[in-house]
Amino acid sequence: RRIFPMDGGEGHFIAKFKKQSGVAGKLPALKSKKIDKITEKFLKEQLNTLPNYYYIDKDRVYGMDVPFVDFKKVKVLRQGVYLGDVIKNRFEPSHSFYMVADFDYKRKVDVTLEEMDLFMHGEVLQKECEKGYVAVCFKGHPFGFGKSDGKQIKNKIPKGLRLLPNSHVNID
């Protein structure tokens, strides 16, 4: 309903591809340097199962279970999961690293609905857990991450993804 521009919608773009003769060749794999010891140590501390392939673009580290493909002239935003950045001899994980459901985290903490609401507003949680980065979960599903000093978890959810002050988490 309302998909056409004359009906007030934005319209759609449709493209028709024509297959050229012959069989498509195998796409070349994207070469990457090996991940450093700091990143490898961090990933082993956080995950039970590590990604099979890594790609490093400047200081950004990406991970995937299938090989990265060199698309040459085709503009691709990113392949795989953005794991984080290597900054001054330390690894800083990304929010997307903790949002991937396939990863089995070693360091995670389950919270109540009230704690989830506070955390989604950007508050610090007063909760004891292991020191370092932890996946913050509700009923086993990660919704964010934080850095713990053992007694509290500092919020690392990107500010743009946090809830507004007057909004609250409701589960019916």
Predicted regions and their residues:
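Inter-lobe coupling/hinge region of RecA-like P-loop helicase motors
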Residues: 1-14
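Polybasic, low-complexity RNA-engagement segments
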Residues: 10-12, 20-172
